[in-house]
Structures are given as C-alpha cells and as structure tokens.
Amino acid sequence: MQRNVRRRILSWLLLGSVLLGALTGCGAQAQSEVSSAAVLPEANSVANILERDGYLEGIWFPWLTHDDLGHGFTANETMVKYVGNAWSTVGIDKYGDQYLLEQIYNLKALGFNIMGYEGSIYAEGVIFDENGDVVGIKEDYLQNTRRFLDLCREAEMPVLWTVCCHSTSAVSYYNLEVWYRMTQMYAVKEVADHYVERFVKPLCAVLAEYPDVVVMCAATSEVENEMNDPDMGNFTEERETYGVPRESMLYFVNAVADALAQELPDVDRTLCGSTDNMTIYSETNLTYLGHQEYNADSRADDIANFRSPLPMLITEFGLGDGKYPSEEELVNAQLRFRDNFRAKDWSGWFMWCWSSHSSGSSYDLIAKNGGLTDFRKVAYALHDYIENYRAAYRGETIAVNTPTMFFNKGNGTVEWIKPTQSHTYRLERSVNGGAWTVLTTGGATVDAVGRKYTYQDTTLPAEGTVQYRVIVTAGDATASASSNRVNILQPAVNLVQNHGFENDLAGWTLFGNNGTYRVTNATAHTGAYSLELDYGSVEWQGVYQPSVQVKPNTTYTLTYYYKYAADATAKNAYCFIRGGNGTINVTDVIGQAYMNNGNTDGWEQETISFRTNSDAVCIDFRVVVGSHVYIDDVELCEMQ
C-alpha cells in the first residue's frame, strides 16, 4: 500500500490567488513550496475553514471526473469506487495515487476549499451475510481509506466523509431478492446496530487518524428507490422507502449520528438529504443540518423559506440537473440561488452536479453520475461561476480574473484556462528556482471553445525542476500579475520503442491485414512520419507493441497524439493496454481509451494512466468500422 506519497506538488489555492503545482508524472521529485496560510493545522475543523475563508465552497469528488486524461469513466466507473471498489474493477489500484492527487489539485485551482467524498454511499466496504445482516468491514476498504486520506493530507484538502449509505442503486444489477436483502440495515434495528458496531466504528477509528483532514462526517436522511419499484415509495410524503417506516429509518440515522459523536467528538456532523426529510431529523445528533437541492434553478425559493434550529449547509447542490437551459437562464438561476441561501446566512455548499446545454460553448455537460465528463468543459463553467460568485459576494475584482492552471498532460506541456474576459498574456519559466524568463507572449494554441490554452515547451533542461506561470498583460482591466504556477519535472526515459514511427514499424507488429496499417509521411505530429490506421472491412485490426518491460504493481502513464483523416466516417479508434505476459490477451485489459474527440484539423492528445499487474505490457491500437486515424509520439513512463 502506498501510504506516504512523496510531496511533489508546489501549491495551494489562496482565495485571493491561484497557486497550483503540477507535474508530468515522470521523473525526479519536486521541492514543496506551500503557503503557510493554507497548511492544514494538526487538528482541523469546519470552524477553521470558516474563520480563514469565510465560507465553505465544496464539491463532491466522486461525481466530478474527467475524460481529459483518457480515463473515460462511466456510471459504474466513477471515482465513487476509488476507495470502496465494491462491484467494479475500477479503483484506486487501477488508476493510482497520482491521478487522484492531480484531481484534487485541479479542484483546488477552481476555488474549492473542501471536498466531499462518499465513502460508503452504496454500502462499499460492508460485508453482508446471506440473510442481509452486517457481519464486518472489508480490510482492503480500510487500507484504501487510509490511502485516500493520505493523498488528501498531501494535497492539504479538508474532507467531508459520508459514512453510511442512502442508496443501493448498484443492486439494480441484481434481482429483487438481493436488493431487499441489502436494505435490512434500514428496516431492522438489530441489523442497524450491527452496521454501527461492525462497520461505522471501525471506520471511525481510521478517520480519527486524520484530524487534520476529516473535518465533517455525514449520515443520510433517505434511501432512494433507484429500482423504480412501483410498490416502494420514496421517503417523502408517505414517509417510507423500501417499505421502511419513518421510525426505523430515524433509528438508523440516529444510531449512526450518535456513533459519530462518540467516536469522533471533534468532527462536525451533518446529513445529506432532501428538503422533505429535513424537519423530521432535527432531533438527530448533528452540528449542521444538511440540505440537498437539485433543480436549484426551479426550487430556489424553497430554501429561502426553510427554517432550522441548526446551522444550515447545502450538502448536495445541483444546478440544472439534467436540464439544458440557455446560458442566460443558467446565469440567472445561479444568481437567484445564491441570493436566497446567502440571505439566510447558510455556511456553504457542496456541488453535486451541474448540467447545461451541449452546444460546444463554454458551458457544456459537466458532472453527473453517468456518461463521460470532459474536464476542460468543467473547468470553463466552474471557473466562470467562481468568478461571478466572488465578484458578487467578495468583491475580489483582481483575483477573479486570473487564469487557472492545470496539470500538464505530457512532458513540457503547459495548460491553463483563461479568464472569461479577453486578455493577452506572457508565459514565463523558472529553472531550479532561478529567475523568471519569458517563453512566449502569444505562442500557445487555443481550443475550439477559445478557453483552454496549451503551450509545448521544447527546451526542457537536461535535469532539474521547471516552473511556469502565466501573467495577464493587457485586455483585462481588473487582472494583475497572477501567481499561478505549474511545476514540471524532468521526464524519465520513454519505454516505447520507435515511439514516433520514424523507423517504419520497427518494434511494432501488425494485427490483421484487412485495411491499411502502415507508416506514412502524409502527416505527423512531430518528425516526418506517423502511424496510419485505415479500416477495411474487418473490425478490431491494427498495430501493437508487445512485451514492453515495466515494473509490476506500479502506475504508468501512456501518452500519444491522434488525428482523424478527412475521409473518416466515424471516430471508432481504440487504444488498449494489456497486462499479463505483454501479448495480445483480450481478457487482460488494464487501461484503455476511446478516441472519440479527434478531428481532421489538428492533433488531439490522449493520456491513459494504469496500474501494472505483471512485468510486461502490450500497447495496442485498433480501429473499427469507419475509422481512418493517424497516431504519433507514443510515450510510456512511470508515475513516481
């Protein structure tokens, strides 16, 4: 288990400036440079955050994943499984510590000062017997919980941890008999007691090891009927779900809340639930009453009229929630929503999902369980929202218009999200802590939306640590020189033979002969040649490189560039990383990417992070019907 992740990251976000560290994932260790104002105290709390920042701006980490690094998470592969890994092969061991660390720093760069994590929202880690009784907690769940919290400590990100489930949607993949069995803890007091003694308390013992990280825990106020069984109601007007009466559910929630108060007396407690249920839980052993607000644009008036004897916290905030409003409607909904809950002096909110129209503008599909999420689009909308919020409620007219920098996707690749206003800039570099020198004043490329800037530094030094920062120079009246920085380490040796295809197909092997699979000089990302894969009439043929030597049980990153040909009728190209003995083994895929974002105008970068299960891997590029794609600059390096 990787307990002590080495500090390689540079930064922390201060609410007046964005300071972000980043790295390629390959190479030597970077020096830490963390602001003392942001370092987590030995015993942290919500009160510390409120005193420092004045407000909680949180996000539920499991539902905000991205496709920008080529992971392509789906509903059953979201990071909610990162620790629990209850019924999915996707988890912390597959994607590695570095991926999570990158995610946390990216969220901090967007302005969030606390992160929610649903540690057992779907009963992850719970051991049931054949009758549905709770008999224990999984040891690997406890180990991965420590591993997760070690990384949160490394990134200095406080956490709200959900310690009990309120939904069993995963059992919708089973039959009703199994489904009912897994809900006994809500209905039977003896099973609820066993859940507290055999799961909650052992988990609390681990959470207690992180008083600087775990500042709040959450129980639940409802169980969702995600089976859509017409005979089962939701825990609202009829006061029952799964046939569980209000009294039984209240017993379960209070048992969990009481255990939290006993085992973690210095950690605040809240609920995650809906308005309909909150009044019946005001007697629970809580320090904050949590409120869940979906369709916030249409129900904003409801929360303004809500009353509670406890401090209020919006624990699940979903704006849009599957609807596709116009940008104007989205902005108006934001303002109305904030005006209402701020007027009642609520302590903060945790973003759950954010949906808007998918026309390719700066607002697009963002975070929701199910489907893919493009983190670049996430960055645009969240960045803009935070700008608007700070301008309206904090008067931070300087900080709001700074760029947001992100982890680079490859060696020497620097990326940032520009402010909403037009600007000119200069990109500066510092080597080994030396003087800042100008790299470019306009040489970065811009994506189709016009928000993400990318610059490729081709003059990396032979060794040492390299820092970058972007400074707004003109065109934005409220912006000043930013302190945004991104840190890049000297890369390790690329493990891919003939990675740029400059030596024909040396090191690569053809798989099938139906179609065109060759090296061509028709186009190239760098150099003179690239790999061309043109579908014929037989699917799943292509080119692979077998037996690439790696370390077992180690996280690696594969990066490459691709571009579709003008005559491609579909974007159906794939890259597979196969473990085992490093050969074509269809049952041993340990990493993959679906190349569906490419176009004919420029090259698209793809990155796959994966964890090895042996001492060799196979890199496999395939096409299916309609695909005609070019591949270049394939790079494999170890995340250290």
Regions found by a protein language model. Give the residues of each.
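Pro/Thr/Ser/Gly-rich low-complexity, intrinsically disordered linker/stalk tracts
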Residues: 393-420, 479-490
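Extracellular glycan-recognition surfaces and repeat-rich motifs
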Residues: 502-534, 538
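Active-site mouth of glycoside hydrolases
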Residues: 45-286
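Extra-cytoplasmic beta-strand recognition segments
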Residues: 150, 501, 531, 542-573, ...
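Extracellular carbohydrate-recognition regions
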Residues: 490-512, 640
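Extracellular carbohydrate recognition
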Residues: 540, 602, 622-638
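Extracellular carbohydrate recognition and processing domains
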Residues: 584-616
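Substrate-binding cleft of secreted/luminal carbohydrate-active enzymes
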Residues: 313-394
